[in-house]
C-alpha cells in the first residue's frame, strides 16, 4: 500500500513537471509565431492548440505504455481533446517540441504521423493517409515546416526541413527541404530560394 502510494505520488510529480516543460515549448512557439498573442498566460489558457498538444502528450504516453486498457484510455483522452479543441490528434502520432497550430479548428493528425520540432500548422490541415497503405501510412514532417490553411498532406511521404506548403494544396509526393509547394496536386515552385521553371 505504502509503495503504491509513493509510486503514484512520484508519477504525479514527474508528469506535472514534464507537462510544464512540454507546454512551455508550445506556449513559447505561439508567442513567437502569432502576432496576436498578447502574453504567455493568454496563450496558455486561451489557445486550443496548447491544450490539444498537452492532452496528446499524455495520450501518447498511455498509447505506448502497453499496459492493459491504456490504449482505450489514450483514445478516450484524444477524443475528449478533439471535442474541446476541434483538433484531432491520434495518440500514436509522434510530435516534437514547439508545434504551433494556429486557429486549429479542423486539424487532423493521423496515427503514424511524425512531426519534428518547431512546425506550424494552420486551420483545416490534414496529415492523413490515402486509404491504400498499411503500417506507416501518414506523413513525416521535418523541423521548421509550415503547412498552410486547408492543406492536405497524404500518405507515407516526407516533408523536408523548412518546407512551406501553401493553403489548400494537396500533397501526395515527397517535398524537398527548403522548398515551397502550392496547388492541386501540389508542385514545388521554389527551392533553396530559387524560383523553379514550370513546364
Task: Please place each PLM-identified region on the residue numbering.
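Terminal amphipathic alpha-helical/low-complexity segments used for targeting or macromolecular assembly
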Residues: 1-81, 196-199
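Left-handed beta-helix
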Residues: 84-85, 90-91, 96-97, 102-111, ...
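Conserved phosphate- and dinucleotide-binding cores of soluble alpha/beta proteins
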Residues: 134-138, 196
Amino acid at each position: 500500500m505504502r509503495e503504491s502510494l509513493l509510486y503514484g505520488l512520484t508519477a504525479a510529480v514527474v508528469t506535472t513537471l514534464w507537462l510544464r516543460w512540454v507546454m512551455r515549448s508550445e506556449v513559447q512557439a505561439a508567442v513567437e509565431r502569432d502576432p496576436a498573442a498578447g502574453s504567455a498566460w493568454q496563450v496558455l489558457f486561451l489557445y486550443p492548440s496548447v491544450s490539444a498538444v498537452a492532452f496528446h502528450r499524455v495520450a501518447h504516453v498511455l498509447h505506448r505504455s502497453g499496459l492493459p486498457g491504456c490504449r482505450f484510455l489514450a483514445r478516450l483522452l484524444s477524443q475528449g481533446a478533439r471535442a474541446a479543441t476541434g483538433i484531432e490528434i491520434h495518440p500514436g502520432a509522434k510530435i516534437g517540441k514547439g508545434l504551433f497550430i494556429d486557429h486549429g479548428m479542423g486539424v487532423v493528425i493521423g496515427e503514424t504521423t511524425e512531426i519534428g520540432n518547431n512546425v506550424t500548422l494552420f486551420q483545416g490541415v490534414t496529415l492523413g493517409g490515402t486509404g491504400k497503405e498499411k503500417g506507416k501510412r501518414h506523413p513525416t514532417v521535418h523541423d521548421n515546416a509550415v503547412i498552410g490553411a486547408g492543406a492536405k498532406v497524404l500518405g507515407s511521404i516526407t516533408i523536408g526541413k523548412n518546407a512551406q506548403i501553401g493553403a489548400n494544396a494537396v500533397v501526395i509526393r515527397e517535398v524537398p527541404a527548403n522548398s515551397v509547394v502550392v496547388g492541386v496536386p501540389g508542385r514545388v515552385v521554389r527551392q533553396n530560394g530559387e524560383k523553379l521553371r514550370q513546364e
